C-alpha cells in the first residue's frame, strides 16, 4: 500500500453524547485534553499521521454529532469509512446499553462488512465510578467461539436442528458479529492506551485489508496477461 491515496484511512468515532468522542479526537490529534464538555455541532474531524512498519498513514478521524442517528448512517457520511470506533462511557451504564442499538443500525449500513468496528470503553481513569464491568463487556460483545463450535456439532447430528439454527443465525446475525468485537479501554484525560488503540486498529485493519489488496493486484495481472495474449495472437 505505497500509493499515497491508499494510505489515507477514514475513521469514524461514534457513540452517545458525553462518552468522550471529542476528547479522544483532540487527544489523538493534538495530544491535549479539555475538561470542559463542549458538544459537537454537526461534524468535526482532524488528521493524525502514524508510521507503521516503515509506512506512513494519514488517519482522517471524524467525530459525528451523537443525537443525529439517522444522518450518521447516511451513505455519504459513511462513504470511504474503513474503521468505526464505537465508544461508551465506563461510568455510564446507559451508554453501554445503547451499544447494541448502534450495532444493529451499523449492521444495516455495513452489510458487506467493509467497515471494521471496534468497541472502546472510555474514562478508565474514573475507577471508583465504574458502572460497567469487564465481565459485562465480555459476556455481551467479546465471547469466544466455543458456542459456535458446539452449534456446528449439533448441526451435524441433527438436520432439523440445522435448519432451525440457520433460521436463528439469520435472525440473530447481529449478535453473532457483535460477540467478536475487538475491545479497548482508554482514558483521554490520562492519555492511557490512546496511542495503543490507534496503532492496534490500524494494524488490524491492514491485516484484514491486505488479502483484498493482493487479490485486486492478482486480478489486474490476470487482465493484463489476457490483454497481452490477445496482442500476441
Swiss-Prot record:
Q: Which Pfam families match?
A: Ras
Low complexity composition bias: which ranges? 144-180
Q: Give residue numbers for sequence motif Effector region.
A: 37-45
**The entry's keywords:** GTP-binding, Nucleotide-binding
Q: Which InterPro entries match?
A: P-loop_NTPase, Small_GTP-bd, Small_GTPase
Name one process (GO BP) from the record: exocytosis
**Which Gene Ontology molecular function entries are recorded, alphabetically?**
GTP binding; GTPase activity
Give positions of region: Disordered: 143-182
Q: Which SUPFAM superfamilies match?
A: P-loop containing nucleoside triphosphate hydrolases
Cellular component annotations (GO), alphabetically ordered: membrane
Gene3D superfamilies recorded:
P-loop containing nucleotide triphosphate hydrolases (3.40.50.300)
Origin superkingdom: Eukaryota
* NCBIfam families, per the entry: small_GTP
Query: Into which family does the record put it?
Result: Belongs to the small GTPase superfamily. Rab family.
Q: What is this protein called?
A: Ras-related protein RabV
Species source reads: Dictyostelium discoideum
* Gene name linked to the record: rabV
Amino acid at each position: 500500500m505505497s500509493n499515497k491515496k491508499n494510505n489515507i484511512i477514514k475513521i469514524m468515532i461514534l457513540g452517545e453524547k458525553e462518552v468522550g468522542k471529542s476528547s479522544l479526537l483532540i487527544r489523538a490529534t493534538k495530544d491535549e485534553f479539555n475538561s470542559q464538555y463542549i458538544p459537537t455541532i454537526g461534524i468535526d474531524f482532524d488528521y493524525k499521521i502514524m508510521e507503521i512498519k516503515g509506512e506512513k498513514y494519514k488517519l482522517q478521524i471524524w467525530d459525528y454529532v451523537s443525537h443525529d442517528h439517522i444522518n450518521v448512517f447516511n451513505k455519504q457520511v459513511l462513504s470511504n469509512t474503513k474503521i468505526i470506533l464505537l465508544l461508551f462511557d465506563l461510568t455510564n451504564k446507559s451508554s453501554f446499553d445503547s451499544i447494541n442499538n448502534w450495532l444493529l443500525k451499523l449492521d444495516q449500513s455495513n452489510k458487506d462488512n467493509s467497515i471494521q468496528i471496534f468497541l472502546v470503553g472510555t474514562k478508565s481513569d474514573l475507577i471508583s465510578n465504574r458502572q460497567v464491568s469487564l465481565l459485562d463487556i465480555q459476556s455481551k460483545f467479546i465471547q469466544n467461539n466455543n458456542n459456535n463450535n458446539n452449534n456446528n456439532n449439533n448441526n451435524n447430528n441433527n438436520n432439523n436442528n440445522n435448519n432451525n439454527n440457520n433460521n436463528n443465525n439469520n435472525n440473530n446475525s447481529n449478535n453473532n458479529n457483535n460477540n467478536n468485537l475487538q475491545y479497548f479501554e482508554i482514558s483521554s484525560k490520562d492519555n492511557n492506551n490512546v496511542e495503543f488503540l490507534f496503532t492496534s486498529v490500524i494494524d488490524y485493519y491492514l491485516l484484514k485489508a491486505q488479502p483484498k489488496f493482493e487479490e485486486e493486484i492478482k486480478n489486474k495481472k490476470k487482465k493484463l496477461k489476457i490483454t497481452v495474449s490477445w496482442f500476441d495472437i
